[in-house]
Amino acid sequence: MRTPLVIGNWKMHGTQALARDLAQSVRDGLKRPRGVEVVVCPPFTVLPAVGEILKGAAVALGAQNCHWEEQGAFTGEVSSAMLAELGCRWVLLGHSERRHVFRETDEEINRKMGAVLRHGMRPVLCVGETEEERRQGLTFTVVEGQLRAGWAGLSPEDLARCVLAYEPVWAIGTGVNATPAQAAEVHGYLRGLVSEVASKELAQTVRILYGGSVKADNAQALTEQPDIDGVLVGGASLQAPGFITIAKKSAARSGPSKE
């Protein structure tokens, strides 16, 4: 049984005060979650404060991005070593906003994957197609290319620590979300692809999340699909009650989530 995973991506939101309040509320609301693993990914500037609040909690700390180099003349960047030192256990990589707004390439994302793994953290590789690519029938082609490039050169041991997230670009921050059936179709394809790229064993154990306008009212319908192992939550993760509800509903297929 793959334990559902729920990740809150706070994006570029949160003053120190807001971040502390949100982290404390999430911690208090998920003291003893059963049947679900929960991660929050705040902005870099509030990682220390949030990490302090989550110390010893059932909710893990993650980051939204990193650089692939250990250190150097990379103005404005943050290395995986720095994130590990702050207590991060997870890092989002290849998010659609990084790919499309900041023009990150598959090669750069692959280098970041290696850096995150070297520092003992777990990477979440995001893949997904744009609205135009979907209209042209290229969904499978796009996500296959992103997966193969992102995982290139990684050992079986490394791949066992990786998580995938399918995030259709047309459903991110738009209020339009893929139906459970649409999401399940791509997740099923990705799981089959993992079997081809890596192994049948990994295909059975790798967790594949869905991200794209996830809210409390659609999380359970999504995670009830057999190949959807949790959700990557954007805007809805900024409201503690809704995020807590999403986490508990996502745990439904593994049994009730208790506080």
Briefly describe each language-model feature range:
Residues M1-E259:
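Active-site loop-to-helix "anion-binding N-cap" substructures in soluble metabolic enzymes
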